[in-house]
């Protein structure tokens, strides 16, 4: 089965359409104002309204106020939510949308136990840990820390690029891979050749 691909940090319609054209399965939109890839809710919903069928838009939040989450997801029934902070399972499930919970992995973590704290999640995203940074570090973590047989589908993130995505899929065998900085010209602006190369590598990996 082909690995799915999420292109994260979408900030404009052109990049969204490029990702769709080359076979992305999901697009991530960052609603964390401290991120250089932040996009305003109205802009994101305008982009989502123009996406082709079967493309999943993913709304990324970091310990966000309920009002912000609701202001985004009320704009489209298509949204899946990605929680990238310290949200509890009860918080995640309260919005009654499919959700992905991100975990920042570091040595010594009981990854299986952390995953099991979110039985209602559609998938778990595993990212690199960096103190004080909720995600988007551009750093690869030690994939050997991921145990076999986790209870949820895994979305692998953290420093993925066109040059390492095949090896990542071969070693980890994730349900999906997630990339942002690894396919950018600058923060928030995607490179069409890199997007094409990454998706091709992931789908053929």
From Swiss-Prot:
It comes from Marinomonas sp. (strain MWYL1). It holds the Pfam family PRAI. The keyword Calcium does not apply. The keyword Amino-acid biosynthesis applies. Disulfide bonds: none annotated. It catalyses: N-(5-phospho-beta-D-ribosyl)anthranilate = 1-(2-carboxyphenylamino)-1-deoxy-D-ribulose 5-phosphate. Its EC number is 5.3.1.24. This is N-(5'-phosphoribosyl)anthranilate isomerase. InterPro entries: Aldolase_TIM, PRAI_dom, RibuloseP-bd_barrel, TrpF_fam. It comes from the Bacteria. It is an enzyme of class 5 (isomerase). Belongs to the TrpF family. HAMAP family: PRAI. One of its GO terms (molecular function) is phosphoribosylanthranilate isomerase activity. GO terms for biological process: L-tryptophan biosynthetic process. Pathway: Amino-acid biosynthesis; L-tryptophan biosynthesis; L-tryptophan from chorismate: step 3/5. Keywords: Amino-acid biosynthesis, Aromatic amino acid biosynthesis, Isomerase, Tryptophan biosynthesis.
